[in-house]
Amino acid sequence: MKKLIWSHLFAIVSILGIWYYHVKIDHLMVILLASVLSLEMGFIAYYSRNIFIRLLASLGLLFFYPQSLGIFLSLVSLEWSTKDIWQSNHFMQYMAYLLAILFIISSALLSLKLLVNAYDISKRYQLATVIPVMLFSSFAFCLEKSGSLGLEGIILNTSAFFNGIQTNMANLDFKALSCLFLVQLLLWGILMED
């Protein structure tokens, strides 16, 4: 219950910080909201007793979790120099951005942990369970960034989405995919193992 309260408080403070200080990072609010939804799906899967709702929440988590990886690309669009950060307005923008990064990474990991715990998977099989999720999210994120393909295309136009997958597979960067996977795996190993 503590995680539920603290994570929602963390989300509210992060969203208000980004909104109030007008942090100008591409798609930061969208990534932040996708992380909130991913975390909510994790909580629903964990606290629900109905297997159908748990399964729907798991599918929702698999939809929103790859969007959280966009925070790693937002680092590219930083506009602060070292001397500019220490000006009062820039410092608060930078701190709001750091708060958003911390929330997005921690909510992504916590949502995966909640998903694993929702299905009562023993500790020795947890890593084997999250590896396919991490591979899927890295693949989906790289596939989306290699072309004009978005995950929302599944809902809007399914046939065009699968044709777009074939087109984007030629441009897929497997080095980026493996790096994103390793970053997620290392963060899981460092932060989530008890």
Describe the predicted segments one by one:
Residues 25-43, 54-59:
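Loop-to-helix transition at the N-terminal end of transmembrane alpha-helices
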Residues 57-66, 129-146:
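Hydrophobic alpha-helical membrane-insertion segments
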Residues 33-44, 98-113, 175-192:
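Hydrophobic cores of alpha-helical transmembrane segments in multi-pass inner/ER membrane proteins
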Residues 44-56, 117-127:
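Membrane-interface helix-boundary motifs at transmembrane edges
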Residues 17-27, 45-49:
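Short, hydrophobic transmembrane alpha-helix segments
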Residues 138-160:
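Juxtamembrane non-transmembrane "cap" segments at the membrane-aqueous interface
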Residues 2-16, 58-61, 131-135:
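Alpha-helical transmembrane segments
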Residues 26, 90-95, 159-186:
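Membrane-interface transmembrane-helix boundary segments in multi-pass integral membrane proteins
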